[in-house]
Amino acid sequence: MNFVRRKFRGKLCAYCSTAKSKTDDHIFAGKFFLEKDRCNLPKVPCCRPCNGKKAELEHYLISVLGFGGRHEQAVENLLTGIPRRLEKNIKLQRKLMASMEPAWLRQGSGLYQPTSVIDFDGSKLEALLKYIGRGLAWHHWGVYLRPEDCVSVAIPIDLGSAVLQSFINPRNFPVRVTNDLGNGTVIYEGMQATEPATLTVWRIVMYGGVVLSSNQTPAGRDAQTSSQWWVFTGPPELGATIDRLKR
């Protein structure tokens, strides 16, 4: 561990690209995973302020996202990891339990499955995904995204994800990477343009596709669910183009 920390110390922080790193940081926090699946998770150099801000987001999301797990280790994580975390955060535990309601989730076959829903702060997920997009760009391609560069998150409905993927021309993003961490705990696909190198697209699926939905769905209508999350990065002048791609 000391060797790894020394390896990154003194480099620019992969998240802010301005401060010098003081440590290394898992792009996807180790506690998202079962202990047996925490080996060889991707790391980046990280400064203390970014490490602290990112850890605050992770503390909430590690405790909440597991409730929607659909991957192979979902039950084990729900029974072992989450209770320990919520015991240390009684306020969050009470808030989640108070918001829990029965619901029906429509499957791909058209059948409805009984489940439960809880309140979720999506702004924390969006903030963490911005860190993740920056971290993955550095980890795979050595790209530092400047503070002024565009880093944008999209959490479209599942139909929108399919349409979005069809619009991304492989010829414009010839550099590709895919990874499966922790036997399906985190699966991501990355795409990078030849020029500029900061133009990247990331598709991320966690916990087998945690299903998120809006609480603004009209009564009597099926909720529009989202299980794939996207991060777009690029120079500031491409911000408008990235926004159009998200739509």
What are these regions (language model features)?
Residues 64-67, 85, 89, 95, ...:
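Residues that form generic nucleotide/phosphate-binding pockets
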Residues 3-6, 37-40, 118, 122:
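Short, charged/polar micro-motifs that form catalytic or ligand-binding hotspots
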Residues 12-43, 54, 59-60:
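Histidine-centered nuclease catalytic patch
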Residues 47:
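Zinc-coordinating Cys/His ligand positions in small cysteine/histidine-rich zinc-finger domains
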Residues 52-91:
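Polybasic, low-complexity binding patches
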Residues 83-122:
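Short flanking/linker segments adjacent to small metal-binding domains or redox-active Cys/His motifs
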Residues 1-12, 127-133:
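Short, charged surface segments at domain edges that flank catalytic/cofactor-binding sites
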Residues 114-247:
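C-terminal, charged low-complexity interaction regions
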